Amino acid sequence: MMEEISLQEKIEKLPLGVACIDGLTNGGLEAGIITEIFGEGGSGKSNVCMLAACSALRLGKKVVFIDSEGFSSERFLSICKADNSKLKVIRVFSLDDQEVAITKFSKIIEKDASYGLFILDSFSEFFRLERTGDNQSRVIDFQRQLSLLSSIAAKRKIPVLITNQIYQDIANGDILPFGGYVVDHIMKAIYRLERLPDGRRKMTVMKHRSVKEGNSVEFRIVQDGISCEVKNGN
């Protein structure tokens, strides 16, 4: 299968509706690629996923949200007042579940143009928990699932958003996303989330095709989502 690419073709974006994040991402999540957000627990990864889902729902799109982190319906409803009847939240409990879910919805989305976003929160949870020491087998599993996700993004021209956990490189102390090069080289956009003092969060561009790496914004997680106001007491 081949497709000619037009240089005049407009790149579609899904804005999150948060000015500071939409500014950082140059308009939102890019369609046709996988975007990765990584960071420590509690840094705001799931909140960003929920905001993205809500944004797509407001546009009348169907959304698939595959969850391994413990999706909070209460939190989602506090963030999103849009009609959620087109949101499909699928809880997975193992690496096999995750692959079955990705495979199932890749086939559904390929035939249904009403889907506008695919979310996997978190991609690496079960790879981390179920690793057996067989690195080659794990790499093959990584590649197979990432290939399916890339296919969803490219064929249907929708954003695919995944979250990833972190580890510390014992050689130099760097904080890196789980999966290393195997995951990194497939991602076209990567953002890091960090927890800062006073409840602030920081989002940094680590890799992007059209945004300068190292650019960052700060925000707060609030009752109804994310606030770009970071002054104390707000």
From Swiss-Prot:
GO terms for biological process: DNA recombination; DNA repair. Gene3D superfamilies: P-loop containing nucleotide triphosphate hydrolases (3.40.50.300). Keywords: ATP-binding, DNA damage, DNA recombination, DNA-binding, Nucleotide-binding. GO terms for molecular function: ATP binding; ATP-dependent DNA damage sensor activity; damaged DNA binding. It comes from the Archaea. Coiled coil: none annotated. InterPro entries: DNA_recomb/repair_Rad51_C, DNA_repair_and_recomb_RadB, P-loop_NTPase, RecA_ATP-bd. NCBIfam families: recomb_radB. Belongs to the eukaryotic RecA-like protein family. RadB subfamily. Involved in DNA repair and in homologous recombination. May regulate the cleavage reactions of the branch-structured DNA. Has a very weak ATPase activity that is not stimulated by DNA. Binds DNA but does not promote DNA strands exchange. This is DNA repair and recombination protein RadB. The lineage of its organism: Archaea, Methanobacteriati, Thermoplasmatota, Thermoplasmata, Thermoplasmatales.
